[in-house]
């Protein structure tokens, strides 16, 4: 039995695990690389992509491979504007027996030129290595910040608001895994091919009811004003446009958000993070004129030709209510009253229906209900 055990171990060392132990014998080691999965693409109703992904370069550091005596701090400071204090803080705060083998992000979204400069001096920056990762890119000319939402990097990238948050489980992909050979200087020697390689799987796509062309037109109309615009398909209830202003630039949230940019947004008295289309309460105002018109026509209480004389004011007991047009609209029928938003016409019209009927019909139109948007 003893001989059999020895033979089995010998077979394992020399045949089954030869590749792994041969790496270690040659002063090489394996580095585990997590391959971040791209999120699903978000399309508008016409299958135009409005959120996609692009690859960026990130630079990481492994404390175990770092040597402060030979590390070229000046090169890093000149190239990517990361000083010695920042690097040492990351290294020495994670230099425990377990943490020292893990990679820690130094800087993300490095351009190819800077990456090339640093890679030419690998021996002077031992402990640093590059990875690729996907970030969001916004391909549409329209600004859908409040609808789409943005991502946050907590333990992992995930949707923090809007569509990105609501459809997190659909949009997020499945990360991949591979191992790289690393020599005794900590320099990457290429991919180690074995059965543990797992390719990242992209998240599933999401298709919105939003019309990006109509959204852009709404932004043009709104200009610099503060407010919101919602356009819906009256037959299906689909939201074609949802605009809230002021807004914010989503590309600022694709990578690291500069502190100045973040502080400026959260301190803005006009609250650009507030989605005025669905997160604020407003008196319904003239929208009730359309509801009232629909009810009286449906119940055949009046015809569209029913007329009144608008002289600019309406007396109700001891109260006087005014039209927005001080000198009045004159003789108006239903069509003209809607076109001119005549207050006096609808003050008269509301007197023709029962209060209980009004209450029931308004609820039937969905007022007071949670929309699920």
Spans of model-derived segments:
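Second-shell loop/turn segments in exported
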Residues: 29-30, 57-66, 73-77, 100-108, ...
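Juxtamembrane extramembrane loops of integral membrane proteins
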Residues: 33-80
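Hydrophobic alpha-helical transmembrane signal-anchor segments
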Residues: 1-20
């Amino acid at each position: 039995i003893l001989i059999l055990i020895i033979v089995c171990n010998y077979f394992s060392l020399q045949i089954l695990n030869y590749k792994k132990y041969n790496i270690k014998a040659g002063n090489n080691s394996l580095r585990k690389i997590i391959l971040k999965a791209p999120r699903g693409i978000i399309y508008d109703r016409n299958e135009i992509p409005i959120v996609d992904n692009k690859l960026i370069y990130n630079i990481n550091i492994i404390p175990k491979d770092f040597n402060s005596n030979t590390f070229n701090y000046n090169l890093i400071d000149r190239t990517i504007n990361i000083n010695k204090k920042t690097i040492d803080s990351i290294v020495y705060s994670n230099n425990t027996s377990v943490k020292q083998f893990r990679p820690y992000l130094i800087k993300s979204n490095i351009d190819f030129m800077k990456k090339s400069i640093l890679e030419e001096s690998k021996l002077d920056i031992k402990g640093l290595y590059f990875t690729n990762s996907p970030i969001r890119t916004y391909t549409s000319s329209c600004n859908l910040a409040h609808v789409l939402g943005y991502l946050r990097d907590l333990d992992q990238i995930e949707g923090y608001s809007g569509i990105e948050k609501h459809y997190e489980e659909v949009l997020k992909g499945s990360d991949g895994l591979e191992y790289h050979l690393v020599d005794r200087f900590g320099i990457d020697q290429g991919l180690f091919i074995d059965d543990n390689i797992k390719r990242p799987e992209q998240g599933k796509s999401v298709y919105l009811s939003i019309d990006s062309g109509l959204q852009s037109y709404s932004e043009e109309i709104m200009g610099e004003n503060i407010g919101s615009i919602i356009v819906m398909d009256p037959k299906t209830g689909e939201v074609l446009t949802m605009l809230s202003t002021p807004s914010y630039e989503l590309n600022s949230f694709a990578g690291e958000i500069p502190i100045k940019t973040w502080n400026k947004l959260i301190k803005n008295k006009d609250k650009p993070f507030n989605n005025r289309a669905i997160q604020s309460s407003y008196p319904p105002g003239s929208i009730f004129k359309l509801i009232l018109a629909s009810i009286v026509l449906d119940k055949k209480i009046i015809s569209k030709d029913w007329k009144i004389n608008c002289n600019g004011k309406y007396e109700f007991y001891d109260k006087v209510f005014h039209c927005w047009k001080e000198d009045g609209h004159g003789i108006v029928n239903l069509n003209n009253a809607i076109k001119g938003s005549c207050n006096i016409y609808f003050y008269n019209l509301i007197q023709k229906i029962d209060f209980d009927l009004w209450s029931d019909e308004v609820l039937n139109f969905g007022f007071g209900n949670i929309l699920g948007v």
